[in-house]
Amino acid sequence: RACPRLAGFLDEVRTRHPDYHARPVPAFGDPAPDLLIVGLAPGMHGANRSGRPFTGDHAGVLLYETLHRFGYASAPQSISVDDGLTLSGCRITNAVKCLPPANKPEPGEIRECNRFLTAEIAALPTHASILALGQIAHQAVLRALGLKLKDHPFVHASDYRLPGGRRLVSSYHCSRYNTQTRRLTPEMFAAVFTLIQSENRSCPSSPSSSPAR
């Protein structure tokens, strides 16, 4: 058990919720995507329950609606692992694979899980874009790539060209708190995807009505 705190917490969760997934949550989507979306970690009653990233809690509502609008998802909702939803040109993962207490992974846990993110990024096509949701995911991507944080600060809608041809675009996380406080609006989130698709010629077709940038 590489992360004793997380492993112990998952043991407790499985006892309280025997029907929950309560294990590391694998990535979901296209195995050779144009876009890799990196979140923070599974949510207690979302991915930790369902076994699919951003599925079953509020954080996935805006994400999957936007993915469907921009042609990446076959449906605007992700309900369960057996709902038939598919992603095309897109894959979703997390910086930390296991549910952390209070949704707050410790620095050592983020570092321990970074090897999985490193492998996921290494498997991407050279033209792929990476969308980091939130500062921790942004920093985890940079760590996985061996890049300095000070040279690539987290800013909403930032767009960094990476060595080898890939891009790192970052956004505020689509959490309930951020969307309810309007720190992140649907229009802001859609603008991030417009930015991603603006120079990604192999991406799915743009939506019928793109937001102003």
Over which residues does each language-model region extend?
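A polyanion-binding, active-site-adjacent surface
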Residues: R1-R201
